[in-house]
Amino acid sequence: MKLKEYFPSILRSFALKNKSVSKIKSRNKNTVPLIVSLTTIPSRLKLVQYTVRSLLCANPQPDKIILWLNEDLESAVPAGLKALEGDVFEIRYSPYTFSHRKLIHSLELFPDRIIVTVDDDVMYHPNLLGQLYKSHLQYPKDIIANRVRSISYNEQGEVLPYKQWKHVTSSSIEDMTMMPVGVCGVLYPVGSLNKQVLNVDLFQELSPKSDDLWFKTMALLNGTLSRFAPYTVEDPIPLVGSQKVALKKTNVNEDRNRVQWENLALHFNIDLKEK
């Protein structure tokens, strides 16, 4: 977390904490037909309520927000998080611990619904869902994301380190190398991902630490384009203390994303190199 992010984070956390639980947990009249799905880990269990609060304060509001927790955490749910459950927000439990559960269980439960995935270590702005849905209406078949990188190769056709994958900031780019990055919110239309997305054994073998790459691969198998959102929002505000345990330390700093992408591309015979 950057030093300049601390003060905005503390201010936003304080503002969300002081909102009336009864007001933010009730259903808003202004809604969009979206299911928001996320997960968290034990080290963030006391912090994730701020992410949930920010989503409950969304305008428009989603039909449902589901937090997937490992079943071993059922007795450890903080009272402040539990109190947010109601018509919109609910906690469900999974036998798994990997990050992919943020989406796979919701795909099983709601195969005919548009699903938005978010991360658990940030606080989102109120217009996030409205802007994502507006972007979806413009490009209804595409996966829409507020942060996108392009899977990049060198002149020899070798995958570049993840830190060198280009950032995409234009919604007009239509290229199968576009990969949504989950932290800023990703919208998945109905049927956008291949049915193999639920193959737990396979993604644990090929991409155990990167749900982004697994979901990108499943989009490619279905011929689904990923697109930078034409209607964007400000980046979410990081939560102070949320980065003690983070996949970024492994995937980015140790370049595991590149290795996992090579595994996926080889297994599924995917070639995104320019001809």
Language model: regions and residue ranges:
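Residues at the starts of beta-strands that form the adenosine-phosphate
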Residues: 63-64, 114, 225
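Active-site-proximal specificity loops/subdomain of glycosyltransferases
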Residues: 68-113
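C-terminal catalytic/acceptor-binding lobe
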Residues: 1-19, 29-32, 50, 202-275
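Active-site beta-to-alpha loop of glycosyltransferases that engages the nucleotide-sugar donor
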Residues: 38-49
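Hydrophobic targeting segments
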Residues: 32-38, 55, 63-68
